[in-house]
Every structure is written in structure tokens, then in C-alpha cells.
Amino acid sequence: RRGFFLSFFPSDTPHYENVLPDGWCLTDIGELLINRDGERKPVSSVIRSKQTSKIYDYYGAAGVIDKVDSYLFDERLLLIGEDGANLLSRNKNNAFFAEGRYWVNNHAHVLDATDKNLLDFIAIVINSMKLDDYITGSAQPKLSQDNLNKIPIVLPPLAEQQRIIAEIKKWFTLIDQIEQGKADLQTTIELTKSKILDLAIHGKLIPQDPNDEPAIELLKRINP
């Protein structure tokens, strides 16, 4: 999937201005989005363990990590991991959405936009990128707010953003179907193997020959 992302967004940042299609522009996260990190609050595991209702998602750097009794946000916003190994490994998307009522701790940046349609496109761009140049620390990788704001965004017109998103979703649906087909095939293979073994050990895999020596006779020879 990342290769598909990268086909839309080349990584040669210094030359963006020379290759931009008509109507596109070069900007960055800081200029384009509204940072709402000041509204997030961490809740310690000790406090969370004492809560009883626990009906709202509690987000960390890579997604939901717990449930809590209350919420900070009640709208769809874009979250981007602030720290943790996933920033470099990208085993999960570094940009993801939170919806409904939820709480965000201080390990995920909270981003909003004057036109929330922008957020879907930005999520695609961020998840297509290697963020190494904007991350500090090796033992504990961190994407600071300052560095997050510097990430360049090649921005098409809003209508074209929507067409790009629709095209990506179409291809991802096809990819998911292929992956599911492979998973279903693997499941079928495993079930078939199990069934063959089950038939074999119950004497039903092949026709039995009444002239075969009984197994009890074999056992007597092995263990007189």
C-alpha cells in the first residue's frame, strides 16, 4: 500500500515547485492545519484503573489503548503519533482518525482544519511518508510539534483531493479483497489439511483392504 501512496506523492521535496500540476501548491502542516495539542490530557494508568464507567476511547500514539469515564473531544479529528517506535517502523498508520466522543493523551498530536475535508487528504500524505527526517531520538523516537509543523504538503485543489481519495479507496478495496482472498485460501488449505489428517487417523481416507494384517498383530510384533 505504501508504494501506491508514494506513486501519488514523490519524495524529492526540493523540486516540488518545479513539478507541481496546475492549481497545486506547496505548503506545510503548520500553515495548513490547526493544532489542538493544548486540549489533550494524559490520565495515568492508576487513575484509569479506578474508573468504573469506561465508555469512551482513550487514544495514545498509535490508536485506542484504553477506555475512560469522560471525554475531551466530540468531533472527528486527525491524530498523529507523537512518540514511540511506530513512528519509524510504521507497523500501524501514524495518522489516524478519532470520531465520536473520546479522550487523547499527550502521545498523539491532535489536528483540526477550517475545512475538515482537508484532514482525509493529509492523513493519506502522512501515511505515505517516511518521517525519519522529522523525528528526534533513537531509543524513544519523537515527532515534536515544531517538526510536525515543518512537514511539507503538496496540496491539490479540494475537488482534486476528493478525486484522489476516491481513487485510492477504490484501489484499496480491491487490494483488501485480494488479501482477504489469500487469507480465505490459506484458511481453506489449513482446514483441508486438518480434514485429511482426521480422515486418515480414522481409517476413512482410503478404502480398507480386509486382507491387511490387523494393527493388533503389528503391535504384538513391536511389543511382544
Predicted regions and their residues:
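Non-catalytic DNA-recognition/assembly elements of restriction-modification systems
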Residues: 8-42, 49-60, 150, 158-165, ...
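A short beta-sheet element
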Residues: 60-127, 136-139, 143-148
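Intrinsically disordered, low-complexity boundary segments flanking structured domains
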Residues: 1-6, 42-48, 64-69, 94-99
